[in-house]
């Protein structure tokens, strides 16, 4: 088994949640009917629907240690997705690092020293 632990940085709960949020945030569009149609097309073309791509379900099943990192100013993958993911992790060790005032994928840039320390500490346990 090659994977010892996971460092999850600005992760989303599901493809559906992320795409629906982006439709609303970026374009002011409701999820219906576009999400339903796009999910159906994805099923026809690639063999999977948006309902099947639920990262939160993978987190629920994971037994490997997981460090969750998220910027509290992230609007691309909303900060509100962090807590459900963290709470879904029921098996194995887990930890959380909230990067204050960091936007999407900027936790490392904004908090380089603390980010590095948290990751080293978590991986070293």
Where are these predicted regions, by residue range?
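Hydrolase active-site cap/lid region
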Residues: 1-48
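Short alpha-helix in the alpha/beta-hydrolase fold that links the catalytic acid
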Residues: 55, 64, 78-87
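Short beta-strand/loop motif that positions the catalytic acidic residue
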Residues: 61-63, 68-70, 74
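Acidic catalytic loop of the alpha/beta-hydrolase fold
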Residues: 72-77, 105-106
